[in-house]
């Protein structure tokens, strides 16, 4: 008995397994065990053939049971499912959204050309009143339009031609839907058309509209409608509004009346904004009152005198003094005027000029270039020089020390030179006149007496030769009077042209005008170029060497033989200086009075100043002529 029960249990388990296996997808024809022995409960082992029932067909996408299973479907999820199932995944870039204002049609598919955006809009007001089946069919309808747009197969004139019908029939057969060309729920469309107009002309008796115009928006018929011109030709009547939603006009009037009511006539029930809200937060104006000055629009902006808030008097600011360890800077006292000037200066911060300002920028090949101010640097330099001169002259200690040091160095050098031969003493008047004239034409008259003594010799301070470095050496002890070839060449025409030197000598009023100009040219030649072997005058290489008389110390015994071979130049200087020694003061006055014309001549002969601009990319100052090449290399 136990064996029979085990055998029967095994048969039942096998039968259950065979029933579950075909349901997984195996066909009955391929499975030889489709016929199983069924055990008779009476004990007989007769084989009873039977067939396995086929699996039921899955629910259609428009089945009625979906109304309860998924009453609020996700439109985007449905779109992705239908795209993979019916459209081969070609609509992945299409957008699907609800439209809350579209009430004329159920759905719209818009396409912006090749490579543009394809968008599907579904009417939320219409489809929320329809069953789920209409939503699915409307979505599939618009997806067919999107497929024709994306695949560039939209050759149908009205959009619902053979290509559209081909895909429509294919999906209807595969899914059991009933996709049509036009939707059939017109009643829902009419529900939202609550603004009616009717024409009083002949068209009120014509089909199909009988003169009615129904719209969901309060937009009366006008020339903006495409059919307006045809209506004016065929009918010529005017439209009058005959219907609108309830309380539509009253709500608008109440809002307008509420806006026209003044603030004093507002109902007492309306609470001010400073009241405590329901959330528990309180307006800060209840804690900290407003202490400013308010203005009422349309009324008197004056505040009563009793309500004006009097600010406490301000204490006068204490004068601030500069620290005692800064003797160069003058002691400044900040009074009320200075404080006002400082406060106004902080408010008047220069704004950054726009590149569109044609007064500040110019267009150079499409790039903005700032227009530089040519007089800006000169004015700043003069103001700084004047400031330092005023500071040094005002400070007695620094001024006395600077003048004393310059005088002591000048006296020592003069004593050394007096102990030498007459070659150094006699031409000093001529060279002093020339050097004084050159220094005057460069930077104007001298301010210190030490400069006239230093200018007697060819190698004085750098101040006499290069006036641009005046700021660096002003107030410091003068350098030792050691003449170098560079200084001599600068004093005799390195930075000055020969014609300017000759013109300076010509203005002195000497009777030997032509001879003086020729002599200056010859001296310029001797001092610039190397000396020839037959020349008796020492070469620039020897000038400034220990063997020359101009730099020989007072304890030197004797000059070298090379210096004794220059009798001709010595005689020339002795003759010319002797003639002009009596009228030195008069010549200096004439040179100073007539000095400005050579300055103008020199400025006229000099080339114009080169305009520099800023690179808008790397902010480097460079000449204007090279800005284009620089921008090409900078923008790469």
Swiss-Prot record:
Motif interval(s): PIP-box: 451-458
PTM annotation, UniProt: Autocatalytically cleaved in response to double-stranded DNA-binding: autocatalytic cleavage takes place in trans and leads to inactivation.
E.C. no: 3.4.24.-
Binding site for Zn(2+) 2: 615, 618, 630, 634
Active site, per annotation: 142
Membrane-spanning segments: none
Motif SHP-box per UniProt: ranges: 290-298
InterPro entries linked: Rad18_UBZ4 (IPR006642), Spartan (IPR044245), SprT-like_domain (IPR006640), SPRTN_ZBD (IPR055220)
Chief place of localization: nucleus
Sequence ranges of Polar residues compositional bias: 302-311, 341-374, 492-523, 545-554
Listed Pro residues bias regions: 313-327
Protein family per UniProt: Belongs to the Spartan family.
Function: DNA-dependent metalloendopeptidase that mediates the proteolytic cleavage of covalent DNA-protein cross-links (DPCs) during DNA synthesis, thereby playing a key role in maintaining genomic integrity. DPCs are highly toxic DNA lesions that interfere with essential chromatin transactions, such as replication and transcription, and which are induced by reactive agents, such as UV light or formaldehyde. Associates with the DNA replication machinery and specifically removes DPCs during DNA synthesis.
Subunit structure as annotated in this protein's UniProt entry: Homodimer.
Record protein name field: DNA-dependent metalloprotease SPRTN
